[in-house]
Amino acid sequence: MKYDVKAFELLSNEEIADGIFDMRVKNDELAPLAKCGQFTHVYVPSKTLRRPISVCDSENGVLRLVYQVKGEGTKIMSEMKKGEAVDILAPLGNGFNIEKGKRYCLIGGGIGVPPMLYTAKQTENPLVITGFRNKDLIILQDDFKNAGAELVLTTDDGSAGVHGFVTDVLKEKINEVDEVCACGPTPMLKAIAQVCKEFNKPCQISLEERM
């Protein structure tokens, strides 16, 4: 797998939900190498460790990185301005193995939702299930619809979409798909893996927790 450290030009860095930012960075050499399910390491000035951010999309030499402000490092990221050079190690990880002819169920929970957008664009008629704690944290719904996905929104508190968890919807619709790909918090992934085991469906998972 080829990856490298390069300076990306920051094109935009906008808040799209409460504490969630949409960063677009350009590098014609590395951006096209990204596969769905892969991630990046973003260098944050004054911080020793890079921040792992999943690839939300890659198109025309532009990487889209959607991230949540959780600490000082990502707060500094959120303050970066258009035109700055961003030091990024990319692309990293194995990504999802997508096979032609299969229908996939793509499940994202919280900040595990963004990598599912690029994955949806690489699949045919995917079923996408997104889960959020409440309506204030909902992101990327129009993007998934524009990608041609069958979309189901869930919220833990019922403030938008289906009241409940992504696994509730998965159990109802799992026989409509051939395989499941999921990204999100560990408890959610464990529950999804258990459902897939019960229904004898292949499952690929990607951890969204910070390394």
State what each model feature region is:
Residues 2-84:
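Ferredoxin-reductase
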